[in-house]
């Protein structure tokens, strides 16, 4: 029975360490996801501003009233 306990304890320990590392990685990915969302929001606002400038420029060229 004792010879079976050592491998089981080792397996339990390694599983616990692995689970802990996975949780840390998942938490880091969640934090990274928030940063990416902020970057996407900033990029989309930049795209909206750029589109507005291009539309104004095209309107200016079409109407020749700049």
UniProtKB/Swiss-Prot annotation:
Disulfide bonds: 60-66
Keyword set, alphabetical order: Amphibian defense peptide, Antibiotic, Antimicrobial, Antioxidant, Cleavage on pair of basic residues, Cytolysis, Disulfide bond, Fungicide, Hemolysis, Secreted, Signal
Localization, UniProt: Secreted
Any one of the GO BP annotations: defense response to fungus
Signal peptide range in chain numbering: 1-22
A GO cellular-component term linked to this record: extracellular region
Distribution of this protein across tissues and organs: Expressed by the skin glands.
Keyword Membrane: no
Propeptide stretches in the record: 23-40
Gene Ontology terms for molecular function: antioxidant activity
Pfam families: FSAP_sig_propep (PF03032)
Keyword Secreted listed: yes
Domain of life: Eukaryota
Protein's job: Displays broad-spectrum antibacterial activity against a range of Gram-positive and Gram-negative bacteria. Also displays antifungal activity against C.albicans ATCC 2002. Has low hemolytic activity, low cytotoxicity and low antioxidant activity.
Similarity annotation: Belongs to the frog skin active peptide (FSAP) family. Brevinin subfamily.
Protein name from the UniProt record: Jindongenin-1a
Lineage, broadest ranks: Eukaryota, Metazoa, Chordata, Craniata, Vertebrata
């Amino acid at each position: 029975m004792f010879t079976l306990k050592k491998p089981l304890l080792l397996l339990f320990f390694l599983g616990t360490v692995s689970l802990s590392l996975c949780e840390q990685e998942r938490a880091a990915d969640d934090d990274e996801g928030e940063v990416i969302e902020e970057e996407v929001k900033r990029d989309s606002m930049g795209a909206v501003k750029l589109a507005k400038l291009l539309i104004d420029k095209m309107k200016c060229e079409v109407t020749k009233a700049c």
